[in-house]
Every structure is written in C-alpha cells, then in structure tokens.
C-alpha cells in the first residue's frame, strides 16, 4: 500500500518519482540483483493504494525477513504487507480479474482529509441522482470520453462490474470496479457525477 501524494503514480516516469522506482530500488539493494516489477495497475499521479499487487522474477528462496527489510528501506509512504511465491504463469496485471477504486468527497471543510478527499462543501449534492447515473455506466462499452486527452490507449473498451455512491455523515464514497481503467478515467467519471449531483447535468446526459 502507499500514500500517493508525493508520487507520479505507480509506474516509472522519466525524471519523476514513482512507487515502482522506489520498490525496485529497495528490492535490488536487498536481493543484490537488478529487480524489475510489474504492477497490477499504474494509478494516476497522487492516487493512493490500499492494496496493490506486483510481481517480480527471482530464482532463489525468499527470506522471511524480506518484508521487514523492505519496510526498513522504503520511504514511510510505502508499506509492503506480504511477499509470497506464485505460479510461473501468474501476471500481476493480466491475471487480475478486476480492479476497484474508491473516491472520497468531503461535504465539510475538513483540513484533515484534504489530501485524501475532494473538498466539496460549498454546494450540496443529490446522491440519488448520482446513483441513478451510476446505472447508466453499465450500458457503456467505450469509455474514451472519460479518458485523458491524448492518452495512448490501444482500446477504450472497459467493463464495469460495480459503481455506487454511499454517504456516511459528511463523507461521500464512490466505489467502482472494472476489468480495467483508462488513465484519468475515475476522476473524469467522478467529475461528471458531481456535475449531475449539483444539477448542472442530468443523469440522462450520460447516454
């Protein structure tokens, strides 16, 4: 898991700090061999991860101390929970059946959640309308309209398995699961949902 506030996503980026770079540097130092990792996803700049999977190839036996060693070497914004052996044909990205994102919106001016939630307290949101719009997402196949402009995607086809808004006090949580996500896709969907919740758009405008 990691706090993505200071990272430009998981994947290595030229001249930018990434989670993958920090993880590979730690693994290579501890295992004394160059290690390359493959993550289950890339995650956008500033996105946090509660549970991110990655795989790497290593021919020797893994020490039980590796998790402790990694957490001692990595910056405090990255935490390794477990290291375990998998089958040779396992692939962190392509073996994943689905991915889940959670997006939080604070309905109050809360400085303590500023790094972890969109502060949207000046105008109320109609959660019912936003959930009505969620149902329309299941009708989509091509999510190109929600992708970052100029993104080099081989295909914009995604399959949504779950999409829902729920409110807990002054916090809204959007949960969405899909087989894959395009760059900036979740943020774009949330932005559109907020437009619907604030009355600037109607759920039917998604069709």
Identify the function of each model-found stretch.
Residues 1-207:
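Structured-RNA-binding interfaces characteristic of tRNA pseudouridine synthases
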């Amino acid at each position: 898991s990691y706090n993505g506030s200071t990272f430009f996503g998981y994947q290595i980026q030229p001249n930018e700090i990434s989670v993958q770079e920090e993880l590979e540097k730690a693994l290579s130092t501890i295992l004394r061999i160059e290690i390359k990792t493959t993550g289950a996803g890339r995650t956008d700049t500033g996105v946090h991860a509660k549970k991110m999977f990655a795989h790497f190839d290593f021919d020797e036996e893994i020490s039980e101390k590796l998790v402790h060693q990694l957490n001692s070497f990595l910056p405090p914004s990255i935490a390794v929970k477990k290291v375990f052996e998998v089958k040779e044909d396992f692939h962190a990205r392509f073996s994943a059946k689905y991915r889940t994102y959670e997006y939080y919106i604070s309905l109050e001016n809360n400085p303590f959640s500023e790094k972890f939630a969109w502060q949207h307290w000046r105008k109320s949101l109609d959660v019912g309308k936003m959930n009505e719009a969620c149902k329309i997402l299941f009708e989509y196949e091509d999510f190109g309209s929600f992708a970052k402009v100029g993104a080099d995607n081989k295909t914009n086809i995604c399959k949504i398995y779950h999409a829902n808004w729920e409110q807990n006090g002054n916090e809204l949580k959007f949960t969405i699961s899909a087989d894959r996500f395009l760059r900036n896709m979740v943020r774009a969907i949330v932005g559109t949902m907020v437009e619907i919740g604030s009355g600037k758009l109607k759920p039917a405008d998604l069709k």
